[in-house]
Amino acid sequence: MKKTPLLNVALSRLIASLGHGDVVVIGDAGLPVPPGVELIDLALTHGVPDFVSTLKVVLSEMQVESHALAKEIFDKQPTALSTLDELNDEGSLGRRDLLSHEQFKVLSRQARAIVRTGECQPYCNIVLVAGVTF
């Protein structure tokens, strides 16, 4: 059995296969998945798993160069934003880009995969751009 926090097979496979610049989206339960983009559906029920816990586990294994958020998170999700700011201050998220929610959905078309959580708070979505460890 793995010793690291991430146990989901599909998510482990995805992270292990990422190259520099590849895009992964972690989204709430309502984020649309564009045709042709892989869906890794972790959602069990409302709030399980939640956005922040899922993000922290992904960050335990993924090197991130930059991330993007929808601007709406500032008004709608101050608690989630506070956690994202802490992770950003730790250096876990790299450069931050802010987009409209519509621009965010367009960018998600480039994702290698979208990870759907059970989060039911709006705008709890993030685009992660893979970095390198060297």
From Swiss-Prot:
Active site per the UniProt annotation: H20
Main localisation: cytoplasm
Gene Ontology CC annotation, any one: cytosol
Top EC group: isomerase
InterPro entries: D-ribose_pyranase (IPR023064), RbsD-like_sf (IPR023750), RbsD_FucU (IPR007721)
Binding site for substrate: D28, H101, Y123, C124, N125
Keywords for this protein: Carbohydrate metabolism, Cytoplasm, Isomerase
MF annotations from Gene Ontology: D-ribose pyranase activity; intramolecular lyase activity; monosaccharide binding
Location(s), subcellular: Cytoplasm
GO biological process: D-ribose catabolic process
Catalytic activity: beta-D-ribopyranose = beta-D-ribofuranose
Record keyword Nucleus present: no
Pathway(s) this gene product operates in, as recorded in its UniProt entry: Carbohydrate metabolism; D-ribose degradation; D-ribose 5-phosphate from beta-D-ribopyranose: step 1/2
Quaternary state and interactors: Homodecamer.
Function: Catalyzes the interconversion of beta-pyran and beta-furan forms of D-ribose.
HAMAP family reported for this sequence: D_rib_pyranase
Family classification: Belongs to the RbsD / FucU family. RbsD subfamily.
Protein name from the UniProt record: D-ribose pyranase
Species classification: Bacteria, Pseudomonadati, Pseudomonadota, Gammaproteobacteria, Pseudomonadales
Gene name in the database record: rbsD
